[in-house]
Amino acid sequence: MRCFKAIVAYDGAYFLGYAKQPNKLGVQDKIESALNALGIKSGVIAAGRTDKGVHANNQALSFHAPKHWNAAKLFHYLAPKLAPHIVLKKLEEKNFHARFDAQKRAYRYLLTKNLKTPFLAPYIACGDYGSLDALNIALKQFIGKHDFSMFKKEGGATTNPNRIIFNALAYKTFIMGHECVVFKIIGDAFLRSSVRLIIQACVQYSLEKITLAEIQAQIHNLKATIRTPIMANGLYLHRVYY
């Protein structure tokens, strides 16, 4: 058997998350079904599991295939079976583990105050976010190593809640005629819905609905003020570093 590394982009609006689902509507279901149709019976490991509605620009995967498959041949046959909602961007033979070998994961979140067309609703979140300066003040609180037990949703199998945030910032840009705030968060790994809970906390602080002290208390596991993640549709797994 040969081990392959794949880089894929997918539209999270068409799936119930990355992981397998009972109704077969997970990204993993689609990819494994496509491989199965080619006679490749392999589980697919991802660098990170995205929630329902969350997109990926460069999700990294690892899987095995029989030795008669090479990267060029497999790309030729696999890519059409994944389209249109999953795009196979790169495929190479590489002995690695997509999850355990990953060093950093980078996420982006797109948020606009005024969405001018419903056709972008699955891809850009819409809502007030206050001031850019306040967002960056809040984001700085998360940089470093922390126990993120109070910044995760229930259901994850992780036993170690400690994670490192290397960089967290927000900046403004224009995307398809919309002024957006882009949140950029890079960490070694993230707990379930942690990125969306972090962004929600920053937005609520910027809107003066919570204080910086309340964010710090939640980071230190003293009291959870933010329990509901921000909407999923603006979030993208942007890049995985190895």
Curated annotation (Swiss-Prot):
Keywords: Isomerase, tRNA processing
Annotated residues for binding of substrate: 107
Reactions mediated catalytically: uridine(38/39/40) in tRNA = pseudouridine(38/39/40) in tRNA
MF annotations from Gene Ontology: RNA binding; tRNA pseudouridine(38-40) synthase activity
Pfam families: PseudoU_synth_1 (PF01416)
Catalytic activity, EC: 5.4.99.12
GO BP term (any one): tRNA pseudouridine synthesis
Catalytic residues identified in the record: 51
Function text: Formation of pseudouridine at positions 38, 39 and 40 in the anticodon stem and loop of transfer RNAs.
NCBIfam families per the UniProt record, alphabetical: hisT_truA
Similarity comment text for this entry: Belongs to the tRNA pseudouridine synthase TruA family.
Subunit and partners: Homodimer.
Protein name per the record: tRNA pseudouridine synthase A
Source organism (scientific name): Helicobacter pylori (strain J99 / ATCC 700824)
Gene assigned in the entry: truA
